[in-house]
């Protein structure tokens, strides 16, 4: 879900071409959830193979990753590890919301209301370990780097970006900024036309670039104050934040208070200072490799077509596109190296 500070954050629309040659660390769980939510049939049922196993996420990962590679982007997917203990309440809340949405989905189906059914089906989306392992396997077969975070994937992606190993972190959530990512790319995996909920209207969704330094300059605060602001309005670790405090009021509080959390700690059932410390110093690892390899053609065909009933013709076409994108990327890198070497 992430922290609700979007109204305060300056951001600008960009084209995929603006990210040409850039390495991007993508929040894998966030992307998988998006694919599972959006790649569905009219009644909200996800794509499945002949054995009833969900494949929406595999379709999304395969074709969207190829699109990114064709745009000259080098994607790496960062997977979540163990969540912090104080996230348990939010995870339980999400589970209950999914169960309620699933009941409403079935009710809408029984009434023949397909639009309502699809809406609730999206809200009922859940990601289990099997879906994650399938996603990892596909990405490895495609030659795409995967990184296993010790805890939050967004924290690991932000760390990689802060080191300069990648250009930016990619996620729909703004938490990456709290974790210190110098740049955040939103809408990277959902770019294109999307239907507005409840309306027969389609809108064009484009990637957005959010630069941490520009955010802090616009709000006239430090990153530490941005974290305090987020805690006041609510994060995944203290859902809902402080009652009655929205983003604008929280901004005013953190600007003029040396220790804005002190006043509200007494009325909170979680340690607000522990949450702040987690954002400042989350568990991360240096054990990762950013190496893009040739795809395993036979492995991809076996996994997607033989095991999950994907169209062999479409998958073969996708593999060819992927190979061309990798070759073009290497050629571009070689040419830029020679340009730099010229006297």
Curated annotation (Swiss-Prot):
Its cofactor is Mg(2+). It is an enzyme of class 3 (hydrolase). Interacts with PCNA. PCNA stimulates the nuclease activity without altering cleavage specificity. Signal peptide: none annotated. Residues 330-338 are annotated as: Interaction with PCNA. This is Flap endonuclease 1. GO terms for molecular function: 5'-3' exonuclease activity; 5'-flap endonuclease activity; DNA binding; magnesium ion binding. Keywords: DNA damage, DNA repair, DNA replication, Endonuclease, Exonuclease, Hydrolase, Magnesium, Metal-binding, Nuclease. Binds 2 magnesium ions per subunit. They probably participate in the reaction catalyzed by the enzyme. May bind an additional third magnesium ion after substrate binding. PROSITE patterns: XPG_1. One of its GO terms (biological process) is DNA repair. HAMAP family: Fen. Mg(2+) 2 binds at residues 173, 175, 236. Mg(2+) 1 binds at residues 27, 80, 152, 154. Its EC number is 3.1.-.-. Belongs to the XPG/RAD2 endonuclease family. FEN1 subfamily. The gene is fen. InterPro entries: 5-3_exonuclease_C_sf (IPR036279), Flap_endonuc (IPR023426), Flap_endonuc_arc (IPR019973), HhH2 (IPR008918), PIN-like_dom_sf (IPR029060), XPG-I_dom (IPR006086), XPG/Rad2 (IPR006084), XPG_CS (IPR019974). Residues 116-258 are annotated as: I-domain. The keyword DNA damage applies. NCBIfam families: fen_arch. Residues 1-98 are annotated as: N-domain. Structure-specific nuclease with 5'-flap endonuclease and 5'-3' exonuclease activities involved in DNA replication and repair. During DNA replication, cleaves the 5'-overhanging flap structure that is generated by displacement synthesis when DNA polymerase encounters the 5'-end of a downstream Okazaki fragment. Binds the unpaired 3'-DNA end and kinks the DNA to facilitate 5' cleavage specificity. Cleaves one nucleotide into the double-stranded DNA from the junction in flap DNA, leaving a nick for ligation. Also involved in the base excision repair (BER) pathway.
